[in-house]
Amino acid sequence: MEDRETHLGTREVNETSPDLLKNTPSNIARLEDVIEQCHGRQKYLAQTRSPSDGSDVRWYFCKVPLAENELAASVPRTDVVGKSEYFRFGMRDSLAIEASFLQREDELLSLWWKEYAECSEGPKLQVNSKKKSIETPSEASVSSSLYEVEEERVGVPVKGGLYEVDLVRRHCFPVYWNGDNRRVLRGHWFARKGGLDWLPIPETVSEQLEVAYRNKVWRRRSFQPSGLFAARIDLQGSSLGLHALFTGEDDTWEAWLNVDPSGFSGIVGYTGNGIKLRRGYAGSYSPKPTQEELRQQKEEEMDDYCSQVPVRHLVFMVHGIGQKGEKSNLVDDVGNFRQITAALAERHLTSHQLSTQRVLFIPCQWRKGLKLSGEAAVDKCTLDGVRRFREMLSATVHDVLYYMSPIYCQAIIDSVSKQLNRLYLKFLKRNPDYVGKISIYGHSLGSVLSYDILCHQHNLSSPFPMDSVYKKFFPDEESPPTPAKADKPCSSHPSSNFEPEKSDQLNNPEKITGQDNNTMAKEPTVLEHHDVIQEDPSLISDSVVANVGLERRGGQEDDHHDSSGAISSQDVPDGADCRTPDSPSCSQEQSWDKESVNSNNEERIKLLQDEVNSLRSKVAQLLSENARILSDEKAKTSVAPKELNNEKVQTEDADAPTSFTPFIKYQKLEFKVDTFFAVGSPLGVFLALRNIRLGIGKGKDYWEEENAIEEMPACRRMFNIFHPYDPVAYRVEPLVCKEYLPERPVIIPYHRGGKRLHIGLQDFREDFAARSQRIMNHFDSVRTRVLTICQSKSADNLDEMEETDDEKDDRSYGSLMIERLTGTRDGRIDHMLQEKTFEHPYLQAIGAHTNYWRDQDTALFIIKHLYRELPDGPNSPTESTEGDDSPKDSSRPHSWIDRREADYDDEELPLTFSDKQITRSFSAEAKKYLKKP
């Protein structure tokens, strides 16, 4: 396999092969062997039996990200890092980083000391760096060149493949989104500073201590001014007078870090003999670990788990509105969702399922880097009153308006499609053998964008949704070119040049029909319908507007050519058709030859100007006549006069095709989508406004006279998840199957199991009413059947009735579409979260739309679906577990419903019908109590 390369400015350094960068289970054992057998590893092994000696090297990453253009060698600025300033990588991640480091140790150390020297040149460099740091926050956005550099970097994968480590720069950077660089530190020497934790020492001091250790400086001990019999080693660090003291023999040596009395010992906290040192990592021996230590331990365990279990399912998280705001961060939202799903999976899934598959959630940021030209104009028009509130609306609600605009819709669709393909190719580059599934999680507007992209994977070109509205008001107009023939979408910007040949083709429909597909894909005009307009005067109002725009555009273009003197003989070839057959100069133009054209340019320009003036006069006559006709037709007075009286329509030539025949060009995704999750989605109202139903195009009779357009997303399954109080969410099932309109959405199980008390009571009442109605219907059917048998003289009527019943049992078109979208005969699309027992609907509606990222019920529902095809154990059959309230593994303490003994301090304990054992026990006790005299 080809070696990967890491770009280091202008210099390239060969990296290890991709299989060496994977933290797979089979790779970890190999990494351990590589580390043990590596020649560079031998010098880091323990050479003594002292308690202060060890060989365990651990890698750390800084909690605070580096500033832009800040070198890693400049931090930390202390000789011992502070507590909680650096976090440890997991054991397996550290092994992978150390193995890669040892393979290129000499080169990496050389580059590191060179960078350290650049940081130590003097105060001049510090002033420049400070000036840069001051200028950086004033910039509106991060430089695009920085992102280009980030794209080229490939390092050692850590933390489940979401981050990578660049050993040359000592950076830890995110892989799938643009984020900050974090300082990476190699912990070989550690110090105990006032507590029980061993904190790492920066590499600059650690390397000096390592040289002293290999030389066994404790053998050259002498009496120090303090009276201590030790060997002193002066160190170069951030503190003046920094030195180390080594005492003891070979197997009992100890070391302390200290500074001279003239130094800043009071600032850095040196007391007595100094800070105790040790070589090699040692864990904490605190009997009561703090919350920070517990979180660190949990994160290390999760990183080790991610390095062992392969990714079998990839989920792209597409955000909705609001990501343009300063406080909005999709990466943090997806990070919270990832932590919640990991905790729920540990409690609700079996060990076999957890060890077989891992789900990777990757954020898809399509709005951060997207700059729309209309945003600047909106900012200029924004009033000063309640400025903050208006800015909040501009960062949230305006995204919906931009997407509904025919001008910016294409840019938004391109941003989402390109981002999805970019993320997938990034993942595939690092996992070339990936054969798992891929799903899309779309929140809010992101679900609408994802749906539109999935619906146009086979037909990549589609009219803008507003085009159907135009056809509704102008049914007699010829439809725009079919998407299959449209090679590219119509531009949303006015054209600066109008070619004479194109103008000639637009005025001659016969020439257009003889052209190739490229010519057919050009923008249609109403001039092609000249004959139809003559037969039906009522259509003049629709055609003359575009005619005016085209004629005015041609006139302006002629003026442009006249003033620039750019017209040549190629502009009007021999035998070319005249612009208008009634023009007085038509016969003259046909009789011209090349010599006369080249010699009489001025005369030809004059004739063209006369022709333009005559055309303008004819247009004015048509406008006046058309205005008289429109005054008699009341049906079109609400639409046509606004366009006829607007002179800007005549001058802005590109507005007509952009407003009425816009086309959206969709990019084909590089992957197949397994499941599409629409969460908190307004998709239902978008489809209703477009008059779209979900189908395969054969439901005309099913939808009767609704004249609906049908489309089907390219995915195996689709789910619509929403909170009942979310003001943005809408149902989807009524647009798929009419019979599902009275059906309630499926209740998503509570993450502790079952349904809440009020939900259970409500379902009990509805189920009781439904069953009672079915019983009554059954009695009515039996009575009708008995009466029919008694009244009939033969069994023919009975056979006919049975055939009629069989016909009634046939499934409808909508139910077939439900099965196509869900994968099961009785599947459902709409799934509703349970509201809390005591909460106000209107107060809950404020945060219901943004709470999906932190909702445990939503996370558990998605996790159960993604693991649905995995059996509970190696020999267990595969079962679907969606919405199942039964425990999956009775031998595990963390089952689906057994949650009473769990500790949930951060959440209220609601009343549910989930614990069947407690319910039975309570019923038994109640019966015993009632039996007592």
From Swiss-Prot:
Positions of region (Disordered): 1-22, 475-517, 553-598, 871-903
SMART domains to which the protein is assigned, alphabetical: DDHD (SM01127)
Coiled-coil ranges from the UniProt annotation: 593-631
InterPro entries per UniProt: AB_hydrolase_fold, DDHD_dom
Pfam families: DDHD (PF02862)
Protein localization: Vacuole membrane
Domain DDHD: from-to ranges: 669-868
Keyword vocabulary terms for this entry: Coiled coil, Hydrolase, Lipid degradation, Lipid metabolism, Membrane, Vacuole
Any one Gene Ontology molecular-function term assigned to this protein's record: phospholipase A1 activity
Role: Involved in vacuolar formation or function (e.g. formation of vacuolar membrane 'bulbs'). Required for amyloplast sedimentation in the endodermis during shoot gravitropism, which are thus acting as statoliths. Particularly important for the negative gravitropism leading to leaf movement observed in darkness.
Protein name: Phospholipase SGR2
Species this protein is from: Arabidopsis thaliana
